[in-house]
C-alpha cells in the first residue's frame, strides 16, 4: 500500500481521465436507435435514451443544436444521430452529445452516400489525373437516358440551337428504380463495344435523393471509370450531386448545361470552357476533400478544448438540480398532505378545535419556509451558473474574435506573430468571428 499510494485516484480524477480517453479515441460517430425517455425541460435542451434490442445509451442535445432538427422527436421513433461520446463527470455516466438528428430512412441514405464517396475517393476513382479531356471536334454524342424523359428533350433542343451538325445516338435506359443502375451500366458497356460516338452524356432530370439513388451505385462508378469513352455526368438540378458526378470526366449541373458543354459555337468557346471547368472542378474537389479531412481534425481538436462543452456540463447539471428540487418539493408536499389528513382524522375523533387551528398555522409556516428555502437554493444555483459562464466567456478565444481580432496561422497550423517567420508566397489562414480567410503573402513590411 505504501508503494502505490501515488497511484490512488480521486473519483473526479478518474472520471476526468475516462472522459479524455473516450472523447479522444472515438471522435464523431453515427448512431442508429429507438428513442425512449424523451424529455424537454424549460431550458430548451433535449434529454433522451437511444436503445436497440439489448442495449441503451443516454443522450443529450442542447438547445443550440436541436433548433436545427426539422421534426419533434417522440418515444418509439427510429432515428439516426451524429455526435460525440462524453462523460458527465458529476455522475460518472457516459453519454452521447448529439449534434444532428435525422429520421432513420433519409439519414441512412445520406450515411451510405458519404461512406461510398470516401471509399471510392480512397480507391482513386475521383483523382484529377485520371480525368480525360473532351475530344476537340465532337461529331457524335451518345446520350444515356430515358428516351421519354424531359432530359432528352432539353438536350436535343440545346444541340439543335447551338450546333445542328452534331449527330445524337440515344442509348435508352432506366433512370429510376431498383434495376436502373444495372440498366445504365449495360448502356455504357454497349456504347463502349460499338465505339460509334465521340463522348457519352449520362443525364436525367431532377428528383429526390431516393429518385436519383441509382446514380450512386458503386457498380456504376466503376463502369464509368473503366469506360474507354469520355463521360459527362449531367444528373438532376444544380444542387443535386451524385457519385456519377464525382467519377465522370466532367460534371454538368443540368442536362441543358451538359449539352452546352458538348456543343461548339463558332469560336470554339464551349470547348475551352469545358476544359477549364473540368480542371477547376477536379481541383476544387481535391481541395474540398483535403479541407474536409483537415476540418474534421480541427473540429475534433476544438471539441476537446471548447469552453462551450464545459458550459453545457454546467447547464445540464443545473437542469438536474432543478428537477431534483421540484421532485423534493412534490414529495415533501405529499408527505405534509398525508400528515394533515391524519391530524384532521384525529381532530374529528376528539373535536379539539384549538389544536386544529395551531396545527394549521404550523403547516402554513412550514410550507412558507420550504418555499423560501427552495427559492434561495434556486437563486444560488443560478448565480453560480452565471458566474461560471462569465468566467468561461472571459477566457474563450471566441470572445477575443468577437471584439474584432483575428488569429492567423501558417500551413502547419502554427500561430504567426512576427514577419520574421514569413516568406513571399507563404499560405496563411486567418480565423475571424464568422468564417476564415485563406491568403498568400505577396509583400512583407517590417514594423516602423
Swiss-Prot record:
It comes from the Bacteria. Keywords: Cytoplasm, Exonuclease, Hydrolase, Nuclease. Pfam families: Exonuc_VII_L, tRNA_anti_2. Its main location: cytoplasm. The keyword Nuclease applies. CDD domains: ExoVII_LU_OBF (cd04489). One of its GO terms (molecular function) is exodeoxyribonuclease VII activity. GO terms for biological process: DNA catabolic process. Its EC number is 3.1.11.6. It catalyses: Exonucleolytic cleavage in either 5'- to 3'- or 3'- to 5'-direction to yield nucleoside 5'-phosphates. It is an enzyme of class 3 (hydrolase). Belongs to the XseA family. Bidirectionally degrades single-stranded DNA into large acid-insoluble oligonucleotides, which are then degraded further into small acid-soluble oligonucleotides. Heterooligomer composed of large and small subunits. This is Exodeoxyribonuclease 7 large subunit. The gene is xseA.
Amino acid at each position: 500500500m505504501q508503494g502505490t499510494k501515488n497511484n490512488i485516484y480521486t473519483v473526479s480524477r478518474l472520471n476526468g481521465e475516462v472522459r479524455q480517453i473516450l472523447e479522444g479515441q472515438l471522435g464523431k460517430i453515427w448512431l442508429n436507435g429507438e428513442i425512449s425517455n424523451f424529455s424537454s425541460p424549460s431550458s430548451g435542451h433535449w434529454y433522451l435514451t437511444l436503445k436497440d434490442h439489448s442495449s441503451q445509451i443516454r443522450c443529450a442535445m442542447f438547445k443550440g443544436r436541436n433548433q436545427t432538427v426539422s421534426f419533434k422527436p417522440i418515444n418509439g421513433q427510429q432515428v439516426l444521430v451524429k455526435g460525440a461520446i462524453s462523460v458527465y463527470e458529476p455522475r460518472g455516466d457516459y453519454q452521447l452529445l448529439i449534434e444532428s438528428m435525422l429520421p432513420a430512412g433519409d439519414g441512412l441514405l445520406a450515411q451510405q452516400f458519404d461512406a461510398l464517396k470516401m471509399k471510392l475517393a480512397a480507391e482513386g476513382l475521383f483523382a484529377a489525373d485520371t480525368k480525360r479531356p473532351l475530344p476537340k471536334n465532337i461529331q457524335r454524342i451518345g446520350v444515356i437516358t430515358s428516351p421519354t424523359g424531359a432530359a432528352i428533350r432539353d438536350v436535343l433542343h440545346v444541340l439543335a440551337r447551338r450546333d445542328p451538325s452534331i449527330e445524337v445516338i440515344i442509348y435508352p435506359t432506366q433512370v429510376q428504380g431498383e434495376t436502373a443502375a444495372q440498366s445504365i451500366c449495360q448502356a455504357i458497356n454497349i456504347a463502349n463495344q460499338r465505339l460509334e460516338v465521340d463522348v457519352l452524356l449520362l443525364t436525367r432530370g431532377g428528383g429526390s435523393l431516393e429518385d436519383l439513388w441509382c446514380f450512386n451505385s458503386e457498380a456504376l462508378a466503376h463502369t464509368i471509370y473503366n469506360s474507354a469513352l469520355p463521360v459527362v455526368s449531367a444528373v438532376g438540378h444544380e444542387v443535386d450531386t451524385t457519385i456519377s458526378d464525382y467519377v465522370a470526366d466532367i460534371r454538368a449541373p443540368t442536362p441543358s448545361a451538359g449539352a452546352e458543354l458538348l456543343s461548339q459555337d463558332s469560336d470554339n468557346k464551349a470547348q475551352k470552357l469545358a476544359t477549364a471547368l473540368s480542371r477547376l472542378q477536379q481541383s476544387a474537389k481535391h481541395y474540398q476533400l483535403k479541407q474536409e479531412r483537415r476540418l474534421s481534425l480541427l473540429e475534433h481538436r476544438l471539441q476537446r478544448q471548447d469552453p462551450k462543452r464545459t458550459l453545457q456540463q454546467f447547464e445540464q447539471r443545473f437542469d438536474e438540480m432543478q428537477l431534483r428540487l421540484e421532485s423534493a418539493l412534490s414529495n415533501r408536499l405529499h408527505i405534509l398532505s398525508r400528515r394533515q389528513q391524519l391530524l384532521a382524522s384525529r381532530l374529528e375523533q376528539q373535536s379539539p378545535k384549538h389544536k386544529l387551528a395551531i396545527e394549521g398555522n404550523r403547516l402554513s409556516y412550514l410550507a412558507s419556509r420550504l418555499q423560501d428555502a427552495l427559492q434561495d437554493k434556486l437563486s444560488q444555483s443560478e448565480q453560480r451558473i452565471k458566474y461560471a459562464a462569465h468566467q468561461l466567456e472571459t477566457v474563450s478565444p471566441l470572445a477575443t474574435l468577437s471584439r474584432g481580432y483575428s488569429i492567423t496561422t501558417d500551413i502547419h497550423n502554427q500561430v504567426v506573430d512576427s514577419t520574421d517567420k514569413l516568406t513571399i508566397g507563404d499560405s496563411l489562414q486567418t480565423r475571424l468571428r464568422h468564417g476564415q480567410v485563406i491568403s498568400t503573402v505577396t509583400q512583407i513590411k517590417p514594423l516602423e
